[in-house]
Amino acid sequence: MEMGMSNADLCQHFYEIHKSIYSWFDCSFDHFGRTSTEHQTKIAQDIFQKLHANGYVFEQSIEQLYCEGCKKFLADRFVEGVCPHCEYEDARGDQCDRCGKLLSPTELIKPRCKSDATTPVLRTSTHLFMDLAQLSGRLEQWVDSSSVKGKWSANSISITKKWLTEGLHPRCITRDLKWGTPVPLAGFEDKVFYVWFDAPIGYLSITA
């Protein structure tokens, strides 16, 4: 938006910059991948369908922030406001960089649209959620073993275990956006996956 490019052009622009930097340092890759490919889309959608078939995904109608000036629902990073936990004035719609708390855009105090600084309104939209609580036990076992084998940093271990101790909550994995990985489920054709659902899958899909 700030650079006046389409989403696809911006993605290509930074892909070329990253690639040229590695080339300048004489670093080469068997495959220098990205998540905006048909290959990644197919794998991300397949993983979602398996999660959905196994009962880890559910539908829920929620209130979201909508900018009447921009005429669209606002993605997490397009909303800023006051953190309800530490009162940091420039917290984002997904997290507060001061206290580290994960947030939902509707939790922000005095929310404002990052594009035009106006106050967004609440509108209802139906989304898909991943029921992380169902996976808590398996995740704890995995973290206990993988953090040792993978030599995780002390900070990574403490943050992860803090989230597990506090209890995992359902997380919305879809967004009312046009750019992204399409959701392969009837009734959700106009939505895409939240980036933090499909982007980590890229680490797997690039090696497939």
Where in this protein do the model-derived segments appear?
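N-terminal Rossmann-like or analogous alpha/beta NTP/dinucleotide-binding catalytic cores
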Residues: 1-60, 68-72, 84, 141
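Cys/His-rich short segments
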Residues: 55-128
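Structured secondary-structure scaffolds
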Residues: 33-35, 39-43, 86, 95, ...
